[in-house]
């Protein structure tokens, strides 16, 4: 029987006698499957959850359900739960790192999806709090509902071919996401067409590592496997990207026949296999089962495909297996594939692989800009037609109209040609995007971030970011050109701008730019509207018109770095330098111990790789915290810190978050939890001055501070040792504001000038709040400060935790929290039970020594940054300012400068608000003459 809709597809799979499973690996563990369920199990679970969904507050029969998860298992279960209940799921894409973009994205989705019901997990719910009025619910809260005996509302089995099945989001990293309407019949025809094209049957076994928010998972793997009731395995992308050889081990272990891999990952697997003895510490994989590797998202390099095919043949693959394809969300993922890679491409001597022919249900053509249909081998606009195509963008008639020609063919936005054998080849994209390692970025977002950084030496409004694919490269690269404001011979300024742009690019895209070129103003002409042409800039670069400027810049920076490079002075430095050179594939002679990770263009994946390699090479018995890598980016700095880690711990409060820049250093004092991690995001944006943070004593077994006087004395001494002379700039976050105030008084009493004293959302009188915080409350505050739970959850369980503490002790409270904490977050923070317990004790001690604190004395000036207050202390910003913060006036000679900032007390420095906060902070420093 042929399924009429997705629900029937699952029903049919559940009846299959082989009882095959969907198996999911937990994040961080690829040694054994974490969770699995048969198709029958999935159907039963979905039906059970479907009984609960109509009870969700605000849900309507026509509601869109926006699903947001960070793991495969929950995403799959709740996707089918929504389908079973008869609603339309919209699968949320991962949030961007750009706070402003993320907020804009959520506000846009609220309108686009007509006030959707949002379902997520408790550990992710906090991300939605930045936008008012969102109807957000957690799966943990929904599962506590009482289930009725019958399901009211729309029955999933009643859905027809033309009914809307799911909404998939496109361009999720910008504020103009579109929701693609995928229909039941469209999806079913698509997976049938894929299977026919590739010869897939129920004997196949699927492996996926892409999120369900991407059609490369939903249709290419999940639904296609379900169509055949075939086994499917899901692993986290982060686990494969750290060690690409895990792919081969999983293929061997589960006898995988079908998987997906973009070109950048093919290149990573190739590099790993070309290492001498890649499986030195384990058995070689048996790949005789493997036959299909779907590849899409970016152009496939023929040379890399040929190399990987040869390498896989050593492990038993008998034929060509890479299937380069073309697809979009609008076409249910891949819809045009080559089955002759690399042989067809090698015979034609092509650099990039052909994309082959259409699957059943799709036609393609090439047209000119005027609408003329072009003949073979002519480059033009790729257009598609057929029943597997979408019909519309949800709630967006303008975009829908623009997407189709007058005769209803879909405009893909790609330039392409079709050869004499009917094979498709892409020639580029009409749309302005950059695809780096399979991930799409928008040039204007990186341009904005660079401009907002106010980099010394860079002229505002003359920065252009564009994509470029270097010859033989496996992926596109980022290029940046700018107008310098420094003199050509000012090498320090030249290097400073390059490093600042690199740092911002790494933060935004995860990679260092391929080229950063300062240009003459004559090469950056603006239109009558004051715009720079990205297309013309890219064309000029690729035509070689910037080569003179590029060579001059590269030579100057290379010569400067060569004079600055220093040789290793001990074995630890030499080992780290060797790992550094090997990982980034650069000669050891070209780097020194003062070379920074940020100069190399690190991504988070490469930081983890670097960390793991160092731990192995140095045979470390302790885990290197990620913060250690981020705050000690040079080889010498990291070596010194690691030697400290390996030897007796000597406490120093100073943690340098940013060492570069000539402006007055900024000192940041920790909040009540004692740690300085909260300042990392802020330090990324400030490239023109050193940033030092002050960290509490006791994290590494030292005695906790006895009183505030000892804290102030210790921090004052640390500041004077690093910066003997003023002027000084000091700021504190929350509890740290009190300490910054006290340190400033000591500095001024000794004749030093404190030109800037920043108070981040703290009033002068705090002892009443300090007395409210017992150990349990401190632990709960710490837990949501570390994103181990949401603030709402901490408040909700507080009474229960206090009862648990009173009856069984604090250890049981800690057990409760750690059992429910996200594993990935614990691993990222290098947290274990002992560290968490110590941290809670330290934070409680910091609160305790302030229980009798009364402010006294005066400082010359103060800048007060205020956000939404804690519910426990004030009901509104107005009440917070008028009744609490205003009392600082009694302790300052001049009227304080007031700065209203976005977010709430615990989120004002978070990723969602840091972009606007840093602008306000930098402007206030400038206003104070710093």
From Swiss-Prot:
Chain segments carrying region Adenylation (A) domain: 15-436
Disulfide linkage: none
Annotated EC: 2.3.1.-
Cross-referenced Gene3D superfamilies: 3.30.300.30, ACP-like (1.10.1200.10), alpha/beta hydrolase (3.40.50.1820), N-terminal domain of ligase-like (3.40.50.12780)
Location of region: Thioesterase (TE) domain: 665-914
InterPro entries for the chain: AB_hydrolase_fold, ACP-like_sf, AMP-bd_C_sf, AMP-binding_CS, AMP-dep_synth/lig_dom, ANL_N_sf, PKS_PP-bd, PP-bd_ACP
Carrier domain residues: 567-646
Modified residues (O-(pantetheine 4'-phosphoryl)serine): 604
Catalytic activity: 2 3-phenylpyruvate + 2 ATP = polyporic acid + 2 AMP + 2 diphosphate + H(+)
Pfam families with a match to the protein in the record: AMP-binding, PP-binding, Thioesterase
SUPFAM superfamilies the UniProt entry points to: Acetyl-CoA synthetase-like (SSF56801), ACP-like (SSF47336), alpha/beta-Hydrolases (SSF53474)
Keywords: Phosphopantetheine, Phosphoprotein, Transferase
PANTHER family xref list: LONG-CHAIN-FATTY-ACID--COA LIGASE, MALONATE--COA LIGASE ACSF3, MITOCHONDRIAL
The protein's role, per its UniProt record: Nonribosomal peptide synthetase that mediates the biosynthesis of polyporic acid via the condensation of 2 phenylpyruvate units. Polyporic acid is further hydroxylaed by the cytochrome P450 monooxygenase MO6277 into less toxic ascocorynin.
Family: Belongs to the NRP synthetase family.
Stated name of the protein: Nonribosomal peptide synthetase acyN
